[in-house]
Each structure stands twice: as C-alpha cells, then as structure tokens.
C-alpha cells in the first residue's frame, strides 16, 4: 500500500467518525465543539459558559471569577472499516490578568482508530493509527461598553502514515449586555462573530497537502430570569466553511435551556448541516458554586453523519 493510499484511507476513517465526512475535512479537531453545554444546544457556541478558548474567549468577562479550567471528551460511534473508537479530548484554562485582559492555554487530541494495512498485492502489513493534536493559546481584551476582541493560535501536529505540522489562527469579537430586561425580567445577551481555522495547508509529503477547514461563525445567546429560581436561555449560531473550496459547508444550530435554582439544567436543540450532516441534540448539566458538570448527546438524522456524546467538567476559581 503506497503512502498516498494510506493517507487517503486514514483521512476517510477519521472523517467517518465526524461530521465532516462528506466534505473532505480531515482536521475536525479544529472544528468539533468540545463544550458539552453548547453541544446540547445545537452546537451554538455563543452560549459558552466554559471551554472559552475553543468557543468564545470573551465570555470569560461574564463571570466574576479570575481562573477557569475545563476538561472534556467527545466519543463518536464506531466508524466503518476501522477498529477502535474515535474521540476528541480537550483541556483548557483561562486567567483574567486584570479587568480588561485574559489569557488562555489548551490542548486537544483526536484519535483512537486503527486501520489495517496491506501491500500492493493485498497482503497484510502493519496497522496504522492516525491521530491529530493541537497546542493552543488565546488572548482577549475587553474594549468597554460590552465589546471585546480576541485571538487564538494553534500549533497542529497531524499523523496519518506520514507526519505534518502547521498552525491555525482564529480572530473574533463579542458583545455582552447583562443589564437588559425582557418583559420586566432580568436578561443577559451575548453576541459573537469569528473567523476560525485560518492557516496554510498541511504538507504530508508525496504531493499530498490538506487545506485547513476555514470558517466564518456568527451567533448569539439570550438568558432570562423568569422567576427567582427559574431561568430560561436560547442560543442560535451558524458556521460557513469556505475552505477547502471544493468542500464548502453551511451549518446552523440552535437550542433551549431551562435551569432550576442556578444548579440543574436540561437542554435540547437541533443542528442543521448541508449534505445530511444534521443532528438532534440534548443534554443536562449540574452547577454547584464553581463546579460545572455537563453532558450532551448528538443524534445524527442521516447515515452521512455520526452520532456522538460529549461529557465535560469545569471549575471556576
């Protein structure tokens, strides 16, 4: 089996476990949402209350805590033609240096599949275990009057049958207003826009290069305290992948959340994706002081996609 063939099969196996399968995007580690709360709400990342680095770094200014840390895992259903379980795992931390500044660091890993190798005659050779990881940094600055800007950068290492390294960047801005009223009830509004996964192609050698899945994302979230112990929230966001040019993709997701006593939450939503990559989403969460526990399940609506679950734990100090 030649190198190019191995790379193509490895990409297909990785993609078979992710939403990006039909679109030729073999770097789903840069685009898959690792935050369980927003995953349950149609992957509307503007509603992030954790995993700020990978969703909306500016949202850290909505909390009165100085330090935040999160860990999450997304596990996908078994991919056809591969052994093992594909998963994406993430760690992130953020720290507010002052009233207007915050910095972030994180790490992501995607892998878990094993592919059977063979030579040109079909004889078995060694197994191949593709994986990707990223080392990530971020910074956000509060401009004032609810506005903030942010930027993140990622060092990428990708192993198929050959290795490739590269970099990706994200720039965005957000607006928050926590002094709103809706029907005489206190409300909080968050708006977010960004361009992500910007960077040069990854070069695996032998003329095989992979274009990063660059996208534009816009979203918003609104929460309302309808009573002393009852809060409802809604979120909506869209993403348009315009790179690679031959694999353009539009996704739109939204969801609702009900929270009792600022402690227990239930969530549901729907994510539309071109080319039968849609999901029904659902989940629940628990919060106690600074501790956050969340879980989500994303159920595919067609064979082209993949069902998966996400669990996350976080703490704000």
Positions of PLM-derived features:
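Sec/Tat signal peptide C-region and signal peptidase I cleavage site
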Residues: 17-22
């Amino acid at each position: 089996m030649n190198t190019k063939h191995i790379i193509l099969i490895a990409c297909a196996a990785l993609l078979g476990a992710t939403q990006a399968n039909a679109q030729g995007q073999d770097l789903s580690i840069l685009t898959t949402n690792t935050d369980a709360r927003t995953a349950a709400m149609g992957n509307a990342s503007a509603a992030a209350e954790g995993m700020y680095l990978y969703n909306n770094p500016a949202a850290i200014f909505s909390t009165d805590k100085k330090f935040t840390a999160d860990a999450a895992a997304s596990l996908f259903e078994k991919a056809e033609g591969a052994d093992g379980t594909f998963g994406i795992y993430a760690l992130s931390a953020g720290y507010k240096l002052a009233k207007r500044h915050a910095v972030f660091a994180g790490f992501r890993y995607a892998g878990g599949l094993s592919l059977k190798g063979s030579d040109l005659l079909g004889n078995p050779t060694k197994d191949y275990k593709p994986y990707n990881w990223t080392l990530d940094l971020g910074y956000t600055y509060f401009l004032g009057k609810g506005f903030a800007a942010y930027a993140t950068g990622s060092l990428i290492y990708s192993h198929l049958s050959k290795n490739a390294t590269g970099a990706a960047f994200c720039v965005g801005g957000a607006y928050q207003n926590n002094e709103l009223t809706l029907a005489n009830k206190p409300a909080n509004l968050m708006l977010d826009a960004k361009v992500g996964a910007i960077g040069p192609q990854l070069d695996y050698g032998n003329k095989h290069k992979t274009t990063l899945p660059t996208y534009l994302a816009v979203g918003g979230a609104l929460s309302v305290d309808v009573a002393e112990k009852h809060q409802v929230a809604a979120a909506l966001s869209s993403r348009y992948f315009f790179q690679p040019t031959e694999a353009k993709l539009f996704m739109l997701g939204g969801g609702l959340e009900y929270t009792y006593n600022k402690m227990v939450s239930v969530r549901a939503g729907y994510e539309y994706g071109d080319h039968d990559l849609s999901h029904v989403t659902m989940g629940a969460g628990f919060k106690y002081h600074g501790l956050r526990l969340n879980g989500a399940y994303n159920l595919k609506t067609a064979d082209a996609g993949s069902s998966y679950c996400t669990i996350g734990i976080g703490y704000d100090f």
